[in-house]
């Protein structure tokens, strides 16, 4: 079991046990309200591999490679305050492939990756719009919020050896790989450098929350949330700068460093020589493999379903969300 899955399972156990712990303890001090739930999302990536090769643009996403994921959610806010605080643990998968790019240079480069990541995010949210009312015995509310904060991300890019790779037959014969096998790229040092598996990111985005309380004081919350992550790394896709010296790599690392081959050249296209996409012995300026001036980004759009774990007094619940006098039916 890899580290990402272990962290997710541990967090799931903690969230499952949390309601029982809260019930067993006295109410939180200073009127804090707590809610916990599960989330599902789709995730995309923007970096050195894209639909058209435009960095940091949502339209550059390869939409057919968007991946699904799940997460755990915990939110707390102090009664009467507008700011809420969120703790989220998400399993996020991103993926990209030059073979699906409309950019001819990227197409011939023929690199690809997938990255199964674990994100631990601490964010704050601020309501931009709040609406509410009643429907029968239910108290309903809508909140449109701005959200932002910091996150710790564990990532591990992987790739498979292309069956058209010039080294494929030799690698399979020697037992370095099998058909369809995914390999960890960071340990293979495909650009001759090391990079961190834990990085800091900045999630920022918007959310809309629908709240429904059947009269128990413990409302349900359904949230639609979209978050964009700003990162300081250019290695989520294992593509950063230039082709590295193959003599300093393992055979498998060499295969992943350059996956370009003659079979990738489009017919009738005026393309550079295949040597453009590999290390040049004795050259003072090596061929560019990626854009070192940019940083990778990723995003998620998903739904969270959560339930309040601590009771909110009915009167306080109304006063907090709905301004004005309460009207009682005297009849």
Pin down the residues of each PLM region:
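Surface-exposed strand-loop-strand hairpins of Gram-negative outer-membrane beta-barrel proteins
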Residues: 42-73
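Transmembrane beta-strands of outer-membrane beta-barrel pores
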Residues: 40-46, 89-95, 128, 150-156, ...
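Predominantly the C-terminal beta-signal and adjacent terminal strand-loop region
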Residues: 213-331
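Extracellular loop and loop/strand-boundary signature of outer-membrane beta-barrel proteins
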Residues: 54-62, 105-113, 117, 133-134, ...
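Gram-negative (and chloroplast) outer-membrane scaffold detector with strong preference
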Residues: 79-180
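Transmembrane beta-strands of outer-membrane beta-barrel proteins
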Residues: 34-38, 83-87, 120-122, 142-150, ...
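Short loop/turn motifs that connect adjacent beta-strands in outer-membrane beta-barrel proteins
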Residues: 24-33, 79-82, 129-143, 212-222, ...
